[in-house]
Amino acid sequence: DFGRAYCPSQYKQSILPDEDALRAFQREDWIGQRFHHPDIVKTFAPTRPRHYLYLIQEHLEGHSLRAWRKANPDAPVETMIAFAKPAIKALRALHRRETLHQDVKPDNLFITQTGQLKLIDFGSATVGSISENLNLRAGAAEYAAPEYALGVARDGRADQFSLAVTFYELLTGHYPYGDHYLEAKTPNQFRKLQYTSACKHNPHVPLWLDAALARALSLNPEHRYPELSEFLIDLERPNTHLTLKAKPWLEQNPLLFWQLTSVLLLVCNFILLACWLR
């Protein structure tokens, strides 16, 4: 096919000897061919019969988002937000066809030399109609939603959580729930975890962005965005209502706080005066 560059990838039994790895390789080929989206790496069907196992993908030149961030440590927050948008659009394309990526992390978001972001690696992906979905683990535990550790059903909100962890880490250099996240295995252990504001690690992160990340990173999937489209909207147009909810009461109502404090002190003074006059 003239004018088009390919990147063939062959399954090597000596490196990947187990059946799970073989199925992952086949799954990446099959799922990859189902999608033709500008923000998803293209996988092509072979033009001739296969005599050994391989897959063909478009040739990409560039770096993973992790490598890009390392090479650009001073990149502004606005640039990271700009990268988050095509990542969300790519995941939405998957979710519309009942497909979960299950391994969203900085290494699986690729930045081309032209600055375009591509979602790659479908080895851990699942399709809603496949019965083995619950038995498949997510790729990297530090990015995986709690649903995987708890062994419960998951949907697109699990990918949402992983994406939010990815960009939280890229913005701050830390994970949102600290080192104890990987130790949590039960609902009670997850309930004890506390979200750390991204603003604490990086003062350049605006409060509205931290609020959006905090919602997408809710440990309870019911508290995350129902759809990735809503997350995208809050990244494109800052949600002041969400920001207000995320701010401590004192920051939301500083004047009222000091008014109530003054009234309380006045009442205490009257009580002390009454006791002294007795």
PLM regions: where:
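C-terminal lobe helix-coil module of Hanks-type protein kinase domains
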Residues: 142-242
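AlphaC helix of the protein kinase catalytic domain
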Residues: 65-75
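AlphaC helix of the eukaryotic protein kinase fold
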Residues: 16-34
